[in-house]
Amino acid sequence: MSLTNEQIVDAIAEKSLMEVMELVKAIEEKFGVSAAAPVAVAAAAGPAAAVEEQTEFTVTLKSAGDKKVEVIKAVRAITGLGLKEAKDLAEAGGVLKDAASKDEAEKMKKDLEAAGATVEVK
């Protein structure tokens, strides 16, 4: 006769804390597992990852400003797009480059802001 999960849970609920701890230890030994929560390991790795410096940046054009012609020229130089595509991107705004290096992102931002655009680097 096989026990259901509900019957097993009920049987464990009737045991004392010491008996449950002994049961857990026996299960760990029998199956070669640990009752330690894997979340604790992942949480410990989280802060270490946050300390790492960001290496890839996204350059986003927010606004072309008043000097649209200069901004369109800068967008063309950065992206290599044609005139119409660069004009559409300058007017609508949007992502100019994903996964840019820090130096590359800073140069793009500097060039676009010099042309009169509003730029965001994430």
UniProtKB/Swiss-Prot annotation:
GO terms for cellular component: cytosolic large ribosomal subunit. The keyword Ribonucleoprotein applies. The keyword Ribonucleoprotein applies. Keywords: Ribonucleoprotein, Ribosomal protein. GO terms for molecular function: mRNA binding; structural constituent of ribosome. Signal peptide: none annotated. One of its GO terms (biological process) is translation. It holds the Pfam family Ribosomal_L12_N. Transmembrane segments: none annotated. InterPro entries: Ribosomal_bL12, Ribosomal_bL12_C, Ribosomal_bL12_C/ClpS-like, Ribosomal_bL12_oligo, Ribosomal_bL12_oligo_N_sf. Homodimer. Part of the ribosomal stalk of the 50S ribosomal subunit. Forms a multimeric L10(L12)X complex, where L10 forms an elongated spine to which 2 to 4 L12 dimers bind in a sequential fashion. Binds GTP-bound translation factors. Forms part of the ribosomal stalk which helps the ribosome interact with GTP-bound translation factors. Is thus essential for accurate translation. Belongs to the bacterial ribosomal protein bL12 family. This is Large ribosomal subunit protein bL12. The lineage of its organism: Bacteria, Pseudomonadati, Pseudomonadota, Gammaproteobacteria, Lysobacterales.
